[in-house]
Amino acid sequence: MNNNNFVAVIDSEQMKDEMARLPGEYASVIEELAKARVVRARAEQEVKMIRFVVEKHERDLFKNGIVDKKPTEDAIKMEVALHPKVKAAQEALLDAEEKCYLLEAKKEAYNCKRDMLVSLSALQRAELDTLRFSGAR
């Protein structure tokens, strides 16, 4: 097939079905995204809280006489960063962020689909108007 002779066929019924289905699907994505953002915010708070608890624990080891030498700030930071609970909380945060990014991409895809359907609908109306006016002469 020669690319210069390509003709796009617009199926009016399929386009109407897509236009009818789009708002509900879009609303579902928006709802999922809102929930995912809440999960992400909670995960951020969880990371902060766990980091605080672990840091406090590391500082209390010296205060309570469990370790003889006062830990340096760098040593405390390293212990916090390597703590399994901190790592698990950060992994949960990354998972929550990933879900948000994917849903934001899905939302953008629906926006593009809506724009495309509006453009196709306008193109179809213009073609019908052209046929009406050319046939009226």
Model region roles, listed by residue range:
Residues 1-137:
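Charge-rich amphipathic alpha-helical interaction elements
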